[in-house]
């Protein structure tokens, strides 16, 4: 059974001006160092909090790579939750679960013309190796069983429901199109992601 290990106050966002709390956990199945970032004490004051399960993306979240929209989705969510409250479950699942070095190998294949899924498949991996059981364990540790899920990804919806979390509403993020990621985004849309390119 997972439990909260520590709860630390800090300022987040690109300008480090948004108050939040970062929670660590013990008892997670794989012992990966996943964290929750909580805004406006949403786990204590909201019966159905806004939640995003965000998989780590070093290239996008930290270095603002042109290859994906992960950093923009994260920042959009931080800004949204700074106003309405919510919880980001930051999951150590780099490269849809294949790891950083394998993701960089996949980038090389994408440079040769493959899309993100074809590249992963060429390396011997499935389209998406992530499992969200530990995300459910983190929510359970916070006594949360019903959420509003921020995602465009139907796999996340299905997986978290299968682990006993009720979804009251699905909230989509914007399609963050920029030079270098349009092919990537259209590949995701072709695999079922709900992306609105008109906004």
UniProtKB/Swiss-Prot annotation:
Q: Does the keyword Nucleotide-binding apply?
A: yes
What GO terms fall under cellular component here? cytosol
Annotated GTP binding sites? 52-56, 73, 94-96, 116, 151, 156
Q: By its UniProt entry, which Gene3D superfamilies does this protein fall under?
A: GTP cyclohydrolase II
Q: Which domain of life is it from?
A: Bacteria
Report any Pfam family annotated for this entry.
GTP_cyclohydro2
- InterPro entries given for it? GTP_cyclohydro_II (IPR032677), RibA (IPR000926), RibA-like_sf (IPR036144)
Q: Which residues form the active site?
A: 128, 130
Q: What are the GO MF terms of this UniProt record? A: GTP binding; GTP cyclohydrolase II activity; zinc ion binding
Which pathway, per its entry?
A: Cofactor biosynthesis; riboflavin biosynthesis; 5-amino-6-(D-ribitylamino)uracil from GTP: step 1/4
Q: Which reaction does it catalyse?
A: GTP + 4 H2O = 2,5-diamino-6-hydroxy-4-(5-phosphoribosylamino)-pyrimidine + formate + 2 phosphate + 3 H(+)
UniProt xrefs under SUPFAM superfamilies: RibA-like
* Cofactor(s) named in the record: Zn(2+)
Q: Where does Zn(2+) bind?
A: 57, 68, 70
> Which keywords fit this entry according to its UniProt record?
GTP-binding, Hydrolase, Metal-binding, Nucleotide-binding, Riboflavin biosynthesis, Zinc
Q: What is its EC number?
A: 3.5.4.25
Keyword Nucleotide-binding included in the entry's annotation: yes
Per the record, the coiled-coil ranges are: none
Return the similarity comment: Belongs to the GTP cyclohydrolase II family.
**Function (record text):** Catalyzes the conversion of GTP to 2,5-diamino-6-ribosylamino-4(3H)-pyrimidinone 5'-phosphate (DARP), formate and pyrophosphate.
What is the official name of this protein in its record? GTP cyclohydrolase-2
Q: Which organism is it from?
A: Aliivibrio fischeri (strain MJ11) (Vibrio fischeri)
The gene name reads: ribA
């Amino acid at each position: 059974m997972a439990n909260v290990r520590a709860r630390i106050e800090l300022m987040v966002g690109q300008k480090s001006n948004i108050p939040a709390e970062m929670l660590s956990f013990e008892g997670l199945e794989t012992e990966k160092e996943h964290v929750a970032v909580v805004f406006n004490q949403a786990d204590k004051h909201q019966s159905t909090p806004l939640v995003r399960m965000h998989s780590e993306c070093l290239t996008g979240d930290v270095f603002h790579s042109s290859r994906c929209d992960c950093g923009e989705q994260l920042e959009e969510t931080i800004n949204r939750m700074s106003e309405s409250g919510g919880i980001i479950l930051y999951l150590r699942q780099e490269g849809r679960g294949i790891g950083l070095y394998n993701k960089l190998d996949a980038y090389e294949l994408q440079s040769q013309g493959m899309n993100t899924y074809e590249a992963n498949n060429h390396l011997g991996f499935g389209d998406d190796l992530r499992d969200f059981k530990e995300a459910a364990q983190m929510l359970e540790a916070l006594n949360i069983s019903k959420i509003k899920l921020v995602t465009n990804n139907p796999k996340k919806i299905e997986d978290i429901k299968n682990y006993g979390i009720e979804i009251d509403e699905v909230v989509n993020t914007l399609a963050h199109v920029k030079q270098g990621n349009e092919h990537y985004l259209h590949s995701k849309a072709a695999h079922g992601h709900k992306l609105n390119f008109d906004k």
